[in-house]
Amino acid sequence: MALLLGACAMPMRIGLEPEERSKITALAAHVVVVQDEVIAAVQAPTVGAASGGGLIGAMIDASIANSRVKESQQALGSFYTVIEDVDYRKEFNEAIRSELANYQIKVATVTTTPRALNMDILTKLRNQLPSGQALLLIYPRYSLTADFRNFDVESQVSMWTRSDSPSSSGGMNRPIQRSVLYFQSQSVGMGGRKSLDIWGADNAALFRSTLRESITETLRMAMIDLDVATEPSAKAGNLQEEFSFNNGAITTKLKGQVVKSGDTRTILLASDQKLYSLPRTSASASTAAAK
């Protein structure tokens, strides 16, 4: 999906225009979950870049990356046994039907599949749409951070009309809406095997509940993005808030406009134009945007 969208040279974020929204009477939701199991994100080595690049540097990086993957898989071995029956695809399929049942646009059909998309499949799906219906694509990828402390889900979401109906957003090969949604769980433990032990305790109760929460939050962000009346935008003068974000190696900072905030989680439109659902405890500072 990333390659498919990247080939179109599209911006990270395309807001749904009111004109396009007014034409939509129903959605055909198509969820692509290619993965069969959770993986751990592996930090990319940077020896090659530090040494000036070249073949030798690339070979060193490849060797380090392979070693990290093996170490990660070995650490996850016993954890996989506990979550063997976890089916993210099934969980998403059940959740999307209930979560979107009361959405303001009727969801006519829901398809959840492991089959990856290409342009031919996308065109076929679009051409099957009846009048007034739009195709909502959701393509989630889920993982544990490299230190095993967080469960992350990054989803590419886009909405398409029939291929013979050019959109006002830029033509027939461009979606009428696009966004990248990122969920990060509360941090668990101090990292490594100790964090995996917590995730796996009590038949992986915490992991299972966090997985379901990630799906609910992803759908919540998707619905916010499709509501043209509340389309978030990072404008100067809006209140900016700073949040901690674990990338698996270090804790970095994300800064942006708070779109929605609750007791436990906040949805943030960050400067990279991704929409994030982050735990409230990761909020570290609030500052006014530059005047």
Predicted regions and their residues:
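A short, structured loop/turn motif at beta-sheet edges
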Residues: 21-25, 127-132, 159-177
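N-terminal, polar/charged subdomain of small-to-medium soluble alpha/beta proteins
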Residues: 14-25, 115, 122-123, 142-144
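Short beta-strand->alpha-helix linker/helix-N-cap micro-motif
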Residues: 102-119
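A structural "domain/chain start" motif
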Residues: 9-99, 231-291
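Aromatic/basic-lined ligand-recognition segments
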Residues: 153-158
